[in-house]
A protein has these predicted regions:
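Helix-to-loop junctions at the C-terminal end of transmembrane segments
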Residues: 68-82, 165-166, 265-278, 364-365
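Helix-loop boundary and gating motifs at the non-cytosolic
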Residues: 14-63, 216-254, 321
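Juxtamembrane intracellular "pre-TM" segments in multi-pass secondary transporters
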Residues: 2-17, 191-225
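Interfacial helix-cap and linker-helix signal at transmembrane-aqueous boundaries
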Residues: 45-46, 76-77, 148, 163-168, ...
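A membrane-interface helix-boundary motif in multi-pass transporters
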Residues: 163-180, 361-380
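Cytoplasmic helix-loop-helix junction between adjacent transmembrane helices
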Residues: 115-149
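Structural signature of the two symmetry-related core transmembrane helices
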Residues: 85-99, 280-295
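Helix-loop junctions at membrane interfaces in 12-TM secondary transporters
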Residues: 102-114, 297-309
Length: 405
């Protein structure tokens, strides 16, 4: 009898390990692509001869498609239950569309190429967040440990691409990005297939009823302002550092340090959930984000200050994203989970990120990169007010740990 009871236990353990690595794999490659694009794409565009406003507009397309694509694909995922197939479609078409970059089109042609490949690429993550949380089942506290492999992928690519670009022209960047797209495609086909089509899933209340909740409005507004504040960082941080005399390898290492801090945060996040409320952690993270933008604006010529400001990425992205994913899981339920993740991606990373990129472009064009980061600090100050006044946890859930069970 002992032998018979042991076998299922080992089988479940092995199955859990396999699922963990399959889930982690796509995060690695998805964020590896971000590691190739965010730090260096603006430098590539600058090398192509585009102006600061043109660079801001092109970088904003990465965010613009997040407004539409996640909502459309999230709705399809909730409607059909075929999230894995949709992820695979987005990976394949996104990779094929990226090939248009090699034609070296002018401004509007490149914008069209970027709109197409980011439309399909940006559809992947919100769908995959749902796949991951469902794949983890009742053990959702392991989300941070799965998601941290995305940070590992980001760091690996940032460091590798930065080292290569110190030896070759930045014009070669698309050739360095292409293998990462291939990694996304391969990892998408390693995800276990959908277990049948689910036409309609149970959920608590209507989507409209959830969206009119004051706390939910505050949640989206808080994240919208947070992503506006990141516009200068994602668009001009590398150019800002280059203006202060940092090499491409050093720029890559500074980006990597921020994500390394994010990994550390993901590892300990479950402990923070157990001790503090969502509102407490959000207020602390936003305050540290405000400090980060001020330090970058005023003290980028001091390396130790930059090192410290990059460690604060654990707060400005890591803590806020982990909290937001769990918040949506607690508020939107199973029936609206995909649409909740899509709205989070579209309204915050999409609309907020695009507006932040454009606004920072005008500030950099007229006044320089330092003032753009002061604009980021102002946006965070408003986010702090919103969070302090109106943000509350989902009903009956005093902490994120409870909402994750």
């Amino acid at each position: 009898m002992a032998t018979l009871s042991l076998k299922p236990r080992i089988s479940r353990s092995a199955e859990g390990g396999a699922i963990y690595w399959r889930l982690s794999n796509l995060y690695f490659w998805f964020f590896a692509l971000l590691g190739a694009l965010l730090p260096y794409w603006s430098l590539y565009l600058q090398g192509r001869g585009f102006s600061y406003l043109e660079i801001a507009s092109l970088m904003a397309t990465i965010q613009i498609t997040k407004v539409v694509a996640p909502s459309l694909w999230g709705w399809l995922g909730d409607r059909t239950g075929q999230r894995v197939r949709l992820v695979r479609l987005g990976a394949v078409v996104g990779a094929i569309s990226f090939l248009g970059v090699f034609l070296e089109p002018a401004f509007f042609g490149l914008m069209l190429v970027m709109l197409v490949f980011t439309f399909f690429w940006n559809a992947i993550l919100p769908l995959y967040e749902v796949i991951t949380l469902r794949g983890l089942g009742s053990d959702k506290s392991r989300y941070g440990r799965v998601r941290l492999w995305g940070s590992v992928g980001f760091i690996a690519t940032v460091a590798a691409v930065g080292a290569v670009l110190d030896r070759v022209s930045v014009a070669q960047l698309p050739w360095l990005v292409l293998p990462v797209f291939l990694g996304i495609v391969v990892s998408a086909f390693l995800i276990p297939s959908d277990q049948g089509v689910v036409r309609k899933e149970e959920g608590a209340g209507s989507l409209r009823g959830i969206l009119v909740e004051p706390a939910v409005i505050a949640f989206f507004l808080m994240n919208f302002l947070l992503q506006i504040s990141h516009g200068a960082y994602y668009t001009f941080f590398s150019i800002h550092l280059e203006q202060y005399g940092y090499s491409k390898a050093a720029i890559g290492l500074l980006w990597s340090l921020g994500v390394l801090a994010e990994i550390g945060l993901f590892i300990v996040m479950h402990g923070l959930f157990a001790r503090f409320s969502y509102r407490q952690i959000a207020l602390c993270a936003l305050a540290l984000t405000l400090l980060r933008w001020v330090l970058i604006a005023e003290a980028s010529d001091w390396l130790w200050v930059l090192l410290f400001s990059q460690l604060l990425h654990a707060a400005s992205y890591g803590a806020m994203h982990a909290l937001s994913v769990q918040y949506i899981h607690g508020y939107f339920g199973r029936g609206h989970h995909g649409q909740g993740q899509a709205l989070y991606s579209g309204l915050t990373f999409g609309a907020g990120g695009a507006i932040g990129a454009w606004a920072s472009g005008f500030l950099v064009e007229g006044y320089g990169t330092d003032l753009a980061f002061w604009g980021s600090a102002i946006a965070i100050a408003f986010a702090l007010i919103v969070t302090w006044r109106w943000l509350r946890p989902p009903p009956g859930q005093g902490s994120i740990v409870q909402s994750a069970d």
